[in-house]
A protein has these predicted regions:
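N-terminal localization/anchoring segments of enzymes in phospholipid and broader phosphate metabolism
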Residues: 1-218
Length: 221
């Protein structure tokens, strides 16, 4: 029988995903674990009165996308929804154009990235207002927000309430909307300016540790 992605053992699908991420970071490992916690979180946000905005980058989306339907629901429920849709994703151009049109019709703000560059980042941020305070959940992936390919390709998805990562993600989306490629980030490495130097510094650090006989490790996905 075909392999079926399994539930993440650290996530209770009968409880609010938002509350669980606030308590502790969650890591999904596709295709061995199902994408449902992420999809449920976005769906929850679309109907959560405390959620005020949803922002996401989309490179390849499924033709039948539960994620995009939730973004449409969120916009129709009066939330601020911003979508960066990459129209130059090879072989998926028409599908992305069709979803971009549907998202715009629902009231989402759709932007198309910077001239001369493809946006390949996989990042989503949900912002909530609790009284006078704002909280942010940030979702970072190595693969597309795509229900179909998440069952096929090996990728990670981090769901976190880390304040510093949340501030970086907020700045990232602000810079995207302004076409600014030179943001100054504390935790995120963002191409085309900041990612390579960050990686090279990390490699140099581990090289020096290894030369000094100290424990050293490099792990890439």
């Amino acid at each position: 029988t075909p392999f079926k992605p399994q539930p993440n053992p650290n996530i209770d699908m009968t409880r609010s995903i938002r509350e669980q991420v606030l308590q502790h970071d969650k890591l999904l490992f596709y295709p061995y674990e199902a994408m449902n916690p992420f999809l449920d979180l976005v769906h929850e946000a679309a109907y959560d009165p405390e959620c005020i905005s949803l922002r996401i980058t989309l490179y390849r989306v499924a033709k039948q996308s539960r994620l995009c339907e939730s973004l449409i629901d969120a916009a129709e429920n009066g939330k601020e929804v911003t979508v960066l849709m990459e129209l130059r994703a090879r072989f998926d151009e028409q599908n992305n154009i069709e979803w971009a049109e549907r998202l715009e019709e629902a009231g989402c703000t759709v932007i198309y990235g910077s001239e001369g560059f493809k946006c390949h980042s996989k990042i989503c941020q949900l912002t909530y207002r609790e009284g006078m305070a704002l909280t942010r959940l940030t979702l970072l992936g190595t693969g597309n927000f795509n229900e179909k390919t998440a069952k096929l390709y090996s990728d990670f998805m981090l769901m976190t309430a880390h304040p510093g990562i949340g501030e970086d993600a907020n700045l990232f989306f602000r810079n995207l909307s302004l076409g600014n490629l030179r943001g100054d980030y504390r935790f995120l490495g963002v191409a085309p300016v900041g990612l390579k130097p960050l990686i090279m510094r990390g490699l140099d650090r581990e090289i020096q540790r290894a030369l000094a006989g100290e424990p050293a490790r490099v792990f890439f996905k």
